[in-house]
């Protein structure tokens, strides 16, 4: 979606980046507006300067409430005195943010006169127009096995013999919490085996349930018994999108804050069975400096973060949270080892994972499944893989215990062991890397020591690979048919 709103009396300065900046005074905080998503009228995210501490932020917010209340009162008086005059009621303060001691700010619904006063406050760094975010899935249905799991556990392209064979360490995901920041999750689904929990509902007035299915699907790919990469991880649903699959940038930032705080609280408990936290965000909108900073702050707090690259077949750097430098930005690949036709690309894309026709958990019943596509489906493969690798570290009460692997270290490790050069239709400025789980090994140190792998079939075409799969299927079919014929022949002979 294209579009942006600017204040009608302000000149618009458009930089080379996909963010428009509005400003009329050199000493006033700029108003940022994405040019690749739809702004929400009169809704803003305000970010403080680095020197502002929580106490000063609280004082500022008290001042803001006074300004907002006074303005509302003036508008009420004007409404009574002028026949036919009407004005929209503004909600005022909606969220406050303080993420891992790094990002400090708030969001709300304000009249432009109030925003002008906020802009001139010396504590304000910038203001961002709140905007729409949406899930990153593409609709399609196909009832087949989760080939994506098989693909990340094999180096070479899949054949009929290993098409649905997932090689993995049974303890994968144990002791790891996965925060799925999405539409919620069907926590009673049997595939979660009781490991799924409702974390937090951010949109005001929304129910504690997944009325969409998208978040449940992502959760299943991360940690489901049948459909998951890390089959023993715990899932925490953080609902930031409504049942229609869309929401606001400010709600998403608040969801990131909740996950970061939950992780920090869990880390401080000293539970020796707890190994770490991962997060997945299979959603996105236009470029948002605030959301990117929020994700980076959560990573600094210790969360291993995977985000979808986006489904616009465009440069991922123009979208958030895909542009968050400390997260792992994931593009989508197909069964034929090509970049999915919708997948974003570019230098902000770190790695690829299966994202076309992915089968996973769904809503409607505790056994429901669905097959959908998108970078939304690729990202949870990586979130699950992060949980998988984190869990392979020795337990904290073990004689072999080591220091926790940091998000920066694990991101580098994930990239270093990936399968290189196997994908087609990859632009020159995009890493040609496909995720790998170690081929079933439970030895994290050995997986790292073995390092990456350059695919032997890097130069084959998509048509060649499809042909290989079909040939393998035909050979397997004839082999099976021959075995059945032999059994019948032996039975007749007897």
From Swiss-Prot:
It comes from the Eukaryota. Residues 146-448 form the Peptidase S8 domain. One of its GO terms (molecular function) is IgE binding. Residues 43-136 form the Inhibitor I9 domain. Coiled coil: none annotated. Residues 180-198, 209-231 are annotated as: IgE-binding. Keywords: Allergen, Glycoprotein, Hydrolase, IgE-binding protein, Protease, Serine protease, Signal, Zymogen. SUPFAM superfamilies: Protease propeptides/inhibitors, Subtilisin-like. Gene3D superfamilies: Peptidase S8 propeptide/proteinase inhibitor I9, Peptidase S8/S53 domain. It is an enzyme of class 3 (hydrolase). Its EC number is 3.4.21.-. The record marks 311 as: Important for catalytic activity. The active site is at 182 (charge relay system), 214 (charge relay system), 376 (charge relay system). Residues 17-136, 454-494 form a propeptide. Residues 1-16 form the signal peptide. One of its GO terms (biological process) is proteolysis. Belongs to the peptidase S8 family. Serine protease. This is Subtilisin-like serine protease Pen ch 18.0101.
